[in-house]
Amino acid sequence: MASKLTPLTLLLLLLAGDRAFSDSEVTSHSSQDPLVVQEGSRDSVPERDGSRSPIEHTGQSSTWPTTSGSTKISNDTMDQVANESFIQHVQPAAQLPEDSPSQSPVNSSSPPSTASAPPTQAPTEPLCPEPLAWCSDSDRDSSEATLSEALTDFSVKLYHAFSATKKAETNMAFSPFSIASLLTQVLLGAGDSTKSNLEDILSYPKDFACVHQTLKAFSSKGVTSVSQIFHSPDLAIRDTYVNASLSLYGSSPRVLGPDGDANLKLINTWVAENTNHKINELLDSLPSDTRLVLLNAVYLSAKWKKTFEQKKMMASFLYKNSMIKVPMLSSKKYPLALFNDQTLKAKVGQLQLSHNLSFVIMVPQSPTHQLEDMEKALNPTVFKAILKKLELSKFQPTYVMMPRIKVKSSQDMLSIMEKLEFFDFTYDLNLCGLTEDPDLQVSSMKHETVLELTETGVEAAAASTISVARNLLIFEVQQPFLFLLWDQRHKFPVFMGRVYDPRA
């Protein structure tokens, strides 16, 4: 016979079942491997609510803290472990590079990638930057002294190169300033090794800021210098170079035609018109395969500061171990800066010209000491020391007798550039800023100088008779000498050369 369940018995059975379930749940939770929990999916994490127990308590709360407390602690712990696992899997996606926002998040079940991103390389400077036609005021202020120094060094280099090319004991004249202007105009479009080689030849610092603007400011009214680039029709010139060249040098490359004779006439006519017909024929021929021609012509239009005596005077001059008679300039009281240089063993005299120019003569102290000996001792250091001493010397009334100055010199500059160990014009020329054509050579490069100084001066000589004092300084030039036309304002050589035979 079945026993009857009393209310008390039923209550005891319910409490016993609740405790048994709670103990089994705690045992189940505590026996789980945390690693297994971490490797589970996000969906397996229990929800935070009161429905975890299979027995639903309706309207009645338990007075046994161990049952509900154990269940609550286990669930919170599981939530924390699951959340930490989720965060660990999601973190790699948060560490993606900022410049790749389109990449998808990393899957939590996938192993992390071991591939490393390629290293970021610094941007490289273009091999052929566009011509720089701008400079700052601060760079402009410092560039004048730098350019003056460079032109002075370049002058000595050129002197020895011209001397090595010319025949012994012959006259020569050139304009360092004018040649530097032409080469710097080429430098405007040079790239790679051609650019650095030109900078070395010209004694420029690397990437010389404002050199083009400073050269333009160095122009003198007493000197007329013209440069021009001519090219064949098949050579396309970049617009950037044309614009920069026109802005900085007042000229842009001119295209030649198919007729060689017409091209020769075009070039010589241009030179004559731009030198006031002082130079009428710069070229006597032009190669049939001409692609690029560099031309430069310069002449002196300045005059003496004081007029020399107008009467004709002939005097002796030492030429090739014999004395010849040559026309002389003379003045009984010409303002002159004068001293003897022991390094060159030379008398150094400086005469003033118009337009802040001066004419410097270096002549051996005695007939036994020759001009060739002076040339061997001439280097940039000695040259600068002489010019510095002249700057500090006073002009004093001096008896002057010297040959009339008339020198005309024409020179193939390609041979001069090779003497300077610059071979780019004929072998490995890079003018990427001027043209895209990689196969380019300079067909011809010519430089012509005309230098003439007669008795005429800016200021007339006094009409009254001048008595010569016994202690008056004397400067007589009666043997071969080295000369220099110096810009006193900007301190650089405009002309340089030598005179062996004043009659030539």
Curated annotation (Swiss-Prot):
Pfam families: Serpin (PF00079). The record marks A469, R470 as: Reactive bond for chymotrypsin. Residues 40-55 have a biased composition (Basic and acidic residues). InterPro entries: Serpin_CS, Serpin_dom, Serpin_fam, Serpin_sf, Serpin_sf_1, Serpin_sf_2. GO terms for cellular component: extracellular space. Residues 100-125 have a biased composition (Low complexity). This is Plasma protease C1 inhibitor. It comes from Rattus norvegicus. The gene is Serping1.
